[in-house]
Structures are given as structure tokens and as C-alpha cells.
Regions:
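N-terminal leader/linker segments that initiate helical-solenoid repeat arrays
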Residues: 22-63, 68, 72, 82-91
Length: 202
């Protein structure tokens, strides 16, 4: 063998090892994402959103552009129940720190909903679950104390899906908390009417 042939042989061997290594890595990643998906779906099926959070975070590390799983992550943050709630008998500093952690969680949920619900609406404007995602986004804004924005999102949710009649109930509650009694009364009536229409339809 001349030097050129030996060099080419070595180069091909190195390339084959490199390609095999990449292929093995890709296969391992695929196996992990499949296992994570199964775990996430299983937990959400039994309303264990909080337990799904670490699996969702790992899944999104591996697949950063997965729109649906970003929405599931936002939902899990909205529903999470493992954060310590401030108690009246605790020191003020502890209560403040706990409140900040809770607020940070809801702020992240609302940020994720905003980015991904709007993207979903852009790429799949007729998605049957779009109204439901707007509904959850509205709650995250409510819990982030963005009440006016929450009202607009609840209105959008029920416009997209008329079955989300509780949107009217939530809007009425929000208007009451803002001291806008006339608007609250209007939406209480809308809620009652929408509920009655749903019952008649069933």
C-alpha cells in the first residue's frame, strides 16, 4: 500500500467510527425521549402534573422545539402543588420569599402560554384545543395578577369554544375583584344563560 492509500483507509475508518458514534448517540436520545413521553402522558392522564415537571424539563432539554410539550409544561406549572404557601404565623421574610417563588412560577407559566398559544394559533388556527389553551393561559395571567389581560383571554377562550362557559363565571369574579359591579352582573347573567343553553343542547 502506498502512503495515499493508507491515509485514505485511515480517514475512512475514522469517519465510520464517528458516524457510528453519532448514530448510537441519536438512538440513545430517541429511546430517552420515547420513555419521557410515556412518563409524561401517564402522569397527566391521572392529573399528576406536578410530578411530571422534572420529566418535562428533561424532555425539553432534548427536544427544544416541541410546541405541545411546552404547553404541557406551562400547564404543569399552573397546576403545581408542591410550593410552600406563606402562613400568617411565619416571619415576614419567609412569607415574602415564599410568595416570590409562587409568583415566579406563575409568571413563567404565563410567559410560556403566551409564546406557545400564539404560535399554535398561527400554525394551527383550527386546533380543537386552542380555546382550552387560551382558558389555561387566562388563569395563569389571573394568578400573576394581570386581571385585565385575564378577562380578555377568557373572552377569547369562550369565543373559540362556546362550551367553556366557566369563562363567563371567571370574568364576573374578576370584575367583582376590580370593583366593577355592573360588568360583573352582566357576566353573571351571561354565565347563567350559557349554562342553560348547554343543558338544553345536552
Amino acid at each position: 500500500m502506498d502512503k495515499t492509500t493508507i491515509y485514505i483507509f485511515k480517514l475512512v475508518s475514522v469517519c465510520l467510527v464517528f458516524v457510528t458514534s453519532i448514530s448510537a448517540g441519536g438512538s440513545k436520545k430517541k429511546e430517552e425521549t420515547i420513555a419521557l413521553k410515556k412518563q409524561i402522558y401517564g402522569l397527566h392522564k391521572v392529573d399528576e402534573e406536578t410530578s411530571s415537571i422534572p420529566y418535562l424539563e428533561r424532555y425539553l432539554e432534548l427536544s427544544q422545539n416541541e410546541l405541545y410539550f411546552k404547553l404541557l409544561y406551562a400547564k404543569a406549572l399552573l397546576y403545581r402543588n408542591d410550593l410552600s404557601v406563606p402562613k400568617p404565623d411565619e416571619p415576614a421574610e419567609d412569607r415574602i420569599n415564599k410568595a416570590k417563588i409562587i409568583q415566579k412560577n406563575y409568571n413563567l407559566a404565563s410567559k410560556l402560554f403566551q409564546e406557545n398559544v400564539l404560535h399554535l394559533e398561527k400554525v394551527r388556527p383550527r386546533d380543537p384545543n386552542l380555546g382550552r389553551w387560551y382558558y389555561l393561559w387566562a388563569f395563569s395571567e389571573w394568578f400573576s395578577d394581570n386581571k385585565e389581560k385575564s378577562i380578555k383571554l377568557f373572552l377569547k377562550a369562550v369565543k373559540l369554544d362556546y362550551r367553556l362557559t366557566e369563562s363567563y363565571y371567571n370574568i364576573a369574579s374578576l370584575y367583582e375583584s376590580l370593583g366593577q359591579w355592573k360588568d360583573a352582573s352582566l357576566y353573571w347573567r351571561k354565565f347563567e344563560k350559557a349554562e342553560k343553553e348547554l343543558e338544553e343542547e345536552d
